[in-house]
Amino acid sequence: YPGVTNNICAPIIAKESKFNLNEGFYLGYSPERINPGDNKHSLDKIIKVISGSNNKITKIIGKIYETIITAGVFYAKSIEVAETAKAIENAQRDINIAFVNEVSLLCQKLNISVYDVLNAAKTKWNFLPFQPGLVGGHCIGVDPYYLAHIAKKLNSSSDVILSGRRLNDSMTGIVFKKIQKQIKKRSRLLQIGVTF
């Protein structure tokens, strides 16, 4: 979460190494942004956000990444800016999926297809095309809690972030109940998993 690198990692490294930050050691932070299985957005084709504990180390980190990242490098103003950017990228995705999940539940009650609704809505140029379903990956379901943690620490609101997370957490049970209704007694079931 925002502040971990400077407020947690740096003091531990300083204590264990007996060096001072930006004298005996430096810090850099660059969030992972790849999407496993996505060949279109491979490591070299995604803009790399980088940051460092001072301008000198940030430039060094940038030069290293510029040798492998064809999409370019974005120099964040600070490590905290880069950390927060990573957390909100994932929280935003989580919230958008929660919104579409909520719309899906409403469409069920309206006896209309959520996919018909989404197909109609995506004809507008600025509509964001998210699909209802479960949230996967190791970051999407966790980063909203990191943001909520730091928000609580700083006496700031995280109501929208946590609301989306609660809805998405409940979707596993909702999907399971839906499957149970569809399965008749003594039905044969083939379970196939897809993950990354």
Predicted regions and their residues:
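Structural/interface elements that position substrates and couple domains in central-metabolism enzymes
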Residues: 1-196
